[in-house]
């Protein structure tokens, strides 16, 4: 996630402060057996903070973190498990933060190239 945001130029590199709340699927916390939780995703540049600052619910990892084998927070680990699963590819293709990073990166590529005469013909 941090790499995708950095490549797109979206990564917020601020140090310290409260945790960031990126997009979560609606109703994701409904299964938690605690009092009602109202998760409100950040809509400003805080949603692009480094993964280190992402809000973690101890028993319910953010779906993107779970899909990419994030370790549990109960134990200290020297190495992480590594797996390649179809869910990871689907996350990269469909998670709103990855889609937004790809859109912004593609836009910056299009704006950075010099237009050619053939471009007008391609559009028609």
State where each predicted segment sits.
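An acidic, gly/pro-interrupted, aromatic-rich
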Residues: 1-122
């Amino acid at each position: 996630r941090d790499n995708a945001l950095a490549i797109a130029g979206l990564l917020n590199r601020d140090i310290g402060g409260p945790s960031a709340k990126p997009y979560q699927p609606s109703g994701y916390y409904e299964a938690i057996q605690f009092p009602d939780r109202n998760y409100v995703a950040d809509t400003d540049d805080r949603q692009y903070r480094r993964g280190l600052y992402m809000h973690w619910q101890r028993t319910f990892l953010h779906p993107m973190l779970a899909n990419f084998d994030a370790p549990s927070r109960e134990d200290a680990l020297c190495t992480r498990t590594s797996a390649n699963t179809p869910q990871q590819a689907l996350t990269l293709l469909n998670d709103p933060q990855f889609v937004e990073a790809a859109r912004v990166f593609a836009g910056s590529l299009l704006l950075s190239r010099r237009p050619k005469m053939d471009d007008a013909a391609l559009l028609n």
